[in-house]
Amino acid sequence: MKNLAFCLSLAAGAALAGAASAADAKIGRTLAGQCQVCHGIDGIAKIPIAPHLAGESEIYLQTQLKAFRSGAREHEMMTVVAKELSDEDIVNLAAWYASIEISVKVPD
């Protein structure tokens, strides 16, 4: 019985930890205000050298932001911007840009 109670408490703790670190796209949208000059609040790049972010996977976006933050990937602007982001900021930003649905119209 003690083992069952212990396992249940571990499971509950893991569930609470997951809920605390769940991505929040609304917070990400607020944070994206600093990204909008280059990447757009809608994730569609506003300058030629910036990539579109709309619809990219959360994992990809998180990986790239963490790489910029750590210096594993370098870019004059992104390295500086990413250094100021917490893990939670990165998760929320990735959730925002990943949540944007894009559609493509193929020319006739």
Segments and roles (model prediction):
Residues M1-A5:
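Positively charged n-region of N-terminal signal peptides that target proteins for export
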Residues C7-A15:
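Bacterial N-terminal signal peptides
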Residues G43-R73, T79-E84:
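Gly/Gly-Pro-rich "capping" loops immediately C-terminal to redox-active cysteine motifs
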